[in-house]
Amino acid sequence: MEAYLIAIAIGILIYMLLAFGLSLHYGFTGLINFGHVGFFAIGAYTSALLSLKGVPVPVSMAAAAAFAALAAYPLGMIALRLGSDYLAIVTLGFSESVRMVLQTEEWLTRGMHGLPGIPRLFAGWASPQTVDLWIMLLLLAVNAGALLLIHLVIRSPFGRVIEAVRDNEVAVRALGKDPAKFKTRSL
């Protein structure tokens, strides 16, 4: 029963991280982003593919974040200049495109069969019985760090500008700030 509860907690903590990102996009910036899961998939597959090639897990996780950010930047540059409705459509299309590529390109991801043999985090350091517990504790720490980071971002000058963009984009433009630039950074 304990292993089951830890597995459920791991899933909850992963979804909490996704919710923090959506909170920053929609709650503070006012961006309707349906592509969030596409960025998550890019990061997950990047980490998995690099780990399978023997890259250490922490390095592959950092590369995953970098690849997801690299995918978000050009998408944001294009879609955010059009308007919020177009952002929703473009990010939905992006997310669906990522899903289709991951499912059909068997040479890269093995398609619907998935990627077997991905090295587990903490596999060499902890006993098989406690690996999931360590993953859960790491995710708790990452969630706490992400929550603190979002809190600091929102209280910063950047955070005040993105909230102003959400509330009145015309006023932000009148004050000499480029709303598209701040939306892209938020994405």
Regions found by a protein language model. Name each.
Residues 2-187:
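Transmembrane alpha-helices and adjacent helix-loop boundaries
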